[in-house]
């Protein structure tokens, strides 16, 4: 049995659903929301690479690498902001973060 496009799309759909479910279920913890967004981006990357291989085009793989780079930068900046916020407030929650002034 070979692994085809439908298998990759099913895995990506499951990861995307878990990511969206994580955002809706846990709205209090910013770190869980950040990890859920990363899961959604991973599902998008799996779709990009799967369709790129299926269609025989390299553009999807290049775009997936670009999305991975942006996701890594987003995670690094987000975690740096959260660490600074935790040091100042002592708590990381969405309610406290909405009161940030800048």
From Swiss-Prot:
> Does this UniProt record's set of keywords contain Membrane?
yes
Can you tell me where the transmembrane regions are? 5-25, 30-50, 62-82
Q: What is its main location?
A: membrane
For molecular function, the Gene Ontology terms on record are: NADH:ubiquinone reductase (non-electrogenic) activity; quinone binding
UniProt key word Membrane: yes
Which keywords appear in this protein's UniProt record, sorted alphabetically? Answer: Cell inner membrane, Cell membrane, Membrane, NAD, Quinone, Translocase, Transmembrane, Transmembrane helix, Transport, Ubiquinone
- Subunit structure comment from the entry: NDH-1 is composed of 14 different subunits. Subunits NuoA, H, J, K, L, M, N constitute the membrane sector of the complex.
Under catalytic activity, the entry for this protein gives:
a quinone + NADH + 5 H(+)(in) = a quinol + NAD(+) + 4 H(+)(out)
Q: What is this protein called?
A: NADH-quinone oxidoreductase subunit K
Origin species, per record, is Phenylobacterium zucineum (strain HLK1)
Enzyme Commission (EC) number: 7.1.1.-
Q: Which family does it belong to?
A: Belongs to the complex I subunit 4L family.
Q: Name one GO biological process term.
A: ATP synthesis coupled electron transport
Function according to Swiss-Prot or TrEMBL: NDH-1 shuttles electrons from NADH, via FMN and iron-sulfur (Fe-S) centers, to quinones in the respiratory chain. The immediate electron acceptor for the enzyme in this species is believed to be ubiquinone. Couples the redox reaction to proton translocation (for every two electrons transferred, four hydrogen ions are translocated across the cytoplasmic membrane), and thus conserves the redox energy in a proton gradient.
Q: What GO cellular component is one of the record's annotations?
A: plasma membrane
Name its cellular compartments. Answer: Cell inner membrane
InterPro entries in alphabetical order: NADH_UbQ_OxRdtase_chain4L/K, NUOK/Mnh_C1-like
């Amino acid at each position: 049995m070979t692994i085809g496009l439908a298998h990759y799309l099913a895995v990506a759909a499951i990861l995307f659903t878990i990511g969206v479910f994580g955002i809706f279920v846990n709205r209090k913890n910013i770190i869980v929301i950040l990890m859920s967004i990363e899961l959604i981006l991973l599902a998008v990357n799996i779709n990009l690479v799967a369709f790129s291989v299926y269609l025989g085009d390299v553009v999807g793989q290049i775009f997936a690498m670009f999305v991975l780079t942006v996701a890594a930068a987003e995670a690094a900046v987000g975690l740096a902001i959260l660490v600074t916020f935790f040091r100042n407030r002592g708590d990381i929650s969405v309610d406290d973060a909405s009161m940030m002034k800048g």
